[in-house]
């Protein structure tokens, strides 16, 4: 009898066969599932602490997605030859998995939970993110932890006006949509997508299609749990202290209501801090008088937060003004300024209410492209977008340094929004980096980065296909009543039920990201949200077009200029030289950057037009072919007894035989030539070995013949 209680479930899912198994590997984890999709294999494990740490007032969930290089038959680079810090792709995939799982843990569950997914084998055609999400969901389901899952997931492409389930990498490249959707049997929880200006109904159709198609994976997880699941934890939320809730409400409700009449964020935040401090102080007085221990501040803070949420949500559902005084459809005031930084290639300051982004675009050459060493192979990115949000943006102090997961995620969302509207490399040969510095934040800073990024690119002279704007939507849902909010504030994001970000042009959507905190979002609600988002997007696009009608026709004087020439691919080695000596000297002496592709396309970039012209001339000389009959101005390199070696072009020499210098007999070559002397010669012969024979007397004879023909006949 086997020592393993192994359970396997297999199902056909679109183009792919999927295998789930549990009970053999990682048995000491709370839950472990291996997912195999056509040789892309992941191991998802879950460990949950049996009790919460004392005083814990939030849910400590961590999700780590780790790609092992052995999965693709590779050995890692670097001195230690082992995997190092997570790549950007691993960080983004960890976030992708975290987002639909987090809302499904019950309220009040504060035990630490860690989800770790290892990629063990990779089929280059099958991305590992969807198997990883399915595996994490299945591992949680079999673990017995309190989890209101399982979650299913699907990737959807849109090719030839038809949806494609879980496309291969080649299909994704050919698609006008790359959308990932995750959800439960009844509801969608998360959407992440990049699109090529698709209409809202196509985007919504893709979400619905993906949700329908993921049900087979959810059914398979249910079957796996029935046969291989562990007993459910006997966990119950701590009973609510109704007396404490009533006392806190009595003390703070009126003051919290007054705080939310303040329209300025800083004033409101100050007032809320005062209310929190005063309430805690009063409760400590009560406890001292009664001879008891006061409730801890975390518990009181959670009660106050719940009161805040009820106040804000009821005001909005009752049709009252929002926190800052707007109605549900109004976008905050917008101010736009471009060309704000004098020596950058392109810049824009985009301000929407109390959210502000200073965005800078920089143009570079092919050598500046980012090289990505992915499991499926190395590739290059010509467009980079980086998002930074320092603590001062929210009036706080904090750590400044390498980007956190949130910053990496926001940067990728803004990049997705803009990338489909960039010109192709053939139309605009530069590599492009956009950096969004968030200088103020009160909600929707990633969408401010989209707007500011588009404006900075246009200021830099990048011929965008269209203006791109982004907007963040929110939702308040109570029973059958709901309100969709346009351009949400940070507080509305925290207190609401949905964060729904849409970016696009006047023609359609380029990026859609949705995170839902509750079950029960219907197709109709998403339809309303998309329609209202389009209305807000069009308003912002109008403001952007008024400020900047199109891309600058002139690049910044500080941006590199580029010229392209074509050379014979067999001559590439001549331009590069031994150990790179020739190209290194070229770039240093002309002040240019030179990139050479395998097909012989040479790109020369520099801020100096003179330097570019010189580099172009020298490359043309290096790659030029010596032709018989051509006349060259050469330099005598070396004198021999029987002639002279003359340099015609860089790296190309010829022999001027002693008999070809002048018509009369030459006794001593030193009487006619010196090393370093400039001499005009004609190519009279080349052979199959590349040897070149030159003549100076041929030019003398031609000159004599020409002068004789010009002499008038005698009478």
Curated annotation (Swiss-Prot):
Domain of life: Bacteria
Domain KH as annotated: residue spans: 560-619
Chief localization: cytoplasm
Domain S1 motif, residue spans: 629-697
GO biological process: mRNA catabolic process; RNA processing
Reaction catalyzed: RNA(n+1) + phosphate = RNA(n) + a ribonucleoside 5'-diphosphate
Cofactor(s) listed: Mg(2+)
Localization of this protein: Cytoplasm
Any single Pfam family the record assigns to this protein: RNase_PH_C
GO terms for cellular component: cytosol
Positions with a binding annotation for Mg(2+): 493, 499
Protein name: Polyribonucleotide nucleotidyltransferase
Lineage of origin: Bacteria, Pseudomonadati, Pseudomonadota, Betaproteobacteria, Burkholderiales
């Amino acid at each position: 009898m086997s020592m393993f209680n192994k359970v396997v479930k297999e199902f056909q899912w679109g183009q792919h066969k999927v295998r789930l198994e549990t009970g053999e590997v990682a048995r000491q984890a709370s839950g472990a599932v291996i997912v195999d999709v056509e040789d892309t294999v992941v191991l998802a494990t879950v460990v949950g602490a049996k009790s919460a740490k004392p005083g814990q007032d939030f849910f400590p969930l961590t999700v780590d997605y780790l790609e092992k290089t052995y999965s693709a038959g590779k050995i890692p680079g670097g001195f230690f030859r082992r995997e190092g810090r997570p790549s950007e792709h691993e960080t983004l995939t960890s976030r992708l998995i975290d987002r639909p799982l987090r809302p499904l843990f019950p309220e009040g569950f504060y035990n630490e939970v860690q989800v770790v997914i290892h990629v063990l084998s990779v089929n280059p055609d099958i991305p590992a993110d969807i198997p990883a999400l399915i595996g994490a969901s299945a591992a949680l389901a079999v673990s017995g932890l309190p989890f209101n899952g399982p979650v299913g997931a699907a990737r959807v492409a849109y090719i030839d006006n038809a949806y494609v389930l879980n496309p291969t990498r080649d299909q994704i490249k050919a698609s006008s949509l790359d959308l990932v959707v995750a959800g439960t049997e009844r509801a969608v929880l998360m959407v992440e997508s990049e699109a090529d200006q698709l209409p809202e109904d196509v985007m919504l159709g893709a979400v619905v299609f993906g949700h329908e198609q993921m049900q087979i994976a959810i059914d398979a997880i249910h079957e796996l749990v029935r046969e291989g699941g562990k007993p459910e934890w006997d966990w119950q939320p701590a009973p609510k202290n109704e007396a404490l809730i009533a006392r806190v409400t009595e003390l703070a409700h009126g003051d919290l209501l007054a705080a939310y009449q303040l329209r300025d964020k800083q004033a409101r935040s100050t007032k809320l801090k005062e209310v929190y401090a005063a309430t805690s102080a009063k409760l400590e007085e009560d406890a001292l008088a009664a001879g008891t221990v006061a409730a801890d501040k975390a518990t009181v803070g959670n009660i106050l937060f719940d009161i805040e949420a009820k106040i804000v949500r009821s005001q909005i559902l009752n049709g009252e003004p929002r926190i800052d005084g707007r109605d549900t459809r109004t976008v905050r005031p917008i101010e736009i300024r471009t060309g704000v930084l004098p020596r950058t290639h392109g810049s824009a300051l985009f301000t929407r209410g109390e959210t502000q982004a200073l965005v800078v675009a920089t143009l570079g050459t092919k050598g500046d492209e980012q090289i990505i060493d992915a499991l499926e192979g190395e590739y290059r990115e010509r467009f980079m977008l980086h998002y930074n949000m320092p603590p001062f943006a929210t009036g706080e102090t904090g750590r400044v340094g390498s980007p956190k997961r949130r910053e990496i995620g926001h940067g990728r969302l803004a990049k997705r929004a803009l990338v489909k509207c960039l010109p192709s490399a053939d139309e605009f040969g530069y590599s492009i980096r956009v950096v969004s510095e968030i200088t103020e934040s009160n909600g929707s800073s990633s969408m401010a980065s989209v707007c500011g990024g588009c404006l900075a690119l246009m200021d830099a002279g990048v011929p965008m296909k269209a203006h791109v704007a982004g907007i963040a939507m929110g939702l308040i849902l109570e029973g059958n009543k709901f309100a969709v909010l346009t351009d949400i504030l940070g507080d509305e994001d925290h207190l609401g039920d949905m964060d729904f970000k849409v970016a696009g042009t006047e023609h359609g959507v380029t990026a859609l990201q949705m995170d839902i905190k509750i079950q029960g979002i219907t197709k109709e609600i998403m339809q309303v949200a998309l329609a209202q988002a389009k209305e807000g997007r069009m308003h912002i696009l109008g403001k952007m077009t008024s400020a900047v009608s199109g891309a600058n026709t002139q690049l910044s004087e500080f941006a590199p200029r580029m010229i392209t020439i074509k050379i014979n691919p067999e001559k590439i080695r001549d331009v590069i030289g031994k150990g790179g000596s020739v190209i290194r000297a070229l770039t240093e002496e002309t002040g240019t950057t030179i990139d050479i592709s395998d097909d012989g396309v040479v790109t020369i970039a520099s801020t100096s037009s003179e330097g570019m012209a010189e580099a172009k001339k020298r490359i043309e000389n290096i790659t030029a072919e010596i032709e018989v009959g051509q006349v060259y101005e050469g330099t005598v390199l070396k004198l021999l007894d029987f002639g002279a070696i003359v340099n015609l072009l860089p790296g190309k020499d010829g022999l001027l035989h002693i008999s070809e210098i002048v018509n009369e007999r030459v006794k001593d070559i030193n009487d006619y030539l010196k090393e370093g002397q400039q001499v005009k010669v004609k190519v009279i012969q080349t052979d199959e070995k590349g040897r070149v024979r030159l003549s100076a007397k041929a030019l003398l004879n031609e000159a004599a013949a020409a002068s004789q023909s010009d002499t008038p006949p005698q009478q």
